[in-house]
Amino acid sequence: MDRQKLEAQLAELPLYEYAFITTAELLFSQRVRYICETECPMYNTTWACPPAVGTVDACRNRVMAFDEGLLIATITEVSDIANIRETLATRADHEAITRQVLEMVRQQATDTLTLSTEACAHCEHCTWPDAPCRFPDRMFPCVESHGILVTDLAEKHGIEFLAQGNLVTWFSLILYK
């Protein structure tokens, strides 16, 4: 990976921060998955969420097939962070940036795995569990669905997690070979 070339491209995007990471730095926790199961209304409703993504162990194995990655963060302002509808509506801009970064990475990589903020909203009604995903190339599972403590990774790289007042931080993790 030519990091200088990629960094020059990243400088053109409205990223809050980014960091090159190794998968050895990732911390996986069943507790993160438990939050999906008990608090997220998307649990068991899409291909991008548990249980469709597999067990935490299966997710860990899929992730650890890669050695390196790129953690990207964007921030957005909302009028009221407690308004979950407004907050979630801001994910679309982050996902668009994630797709741009993925295309940059793919120019230099032989394989990628992208995890992001999505519980997937590409289809009005997800085919889970009755039929295969209609758009697997567009769907990025949520980082947390894989049991990854993204805030721990961000902290290791000095990326501040803003979820206070009216600022929201969104993260994506693009793994590559």
Predicted features by range, described:
Residues R3, Y16-T46, P50-K177:
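Catalytic cores of enzyme domains
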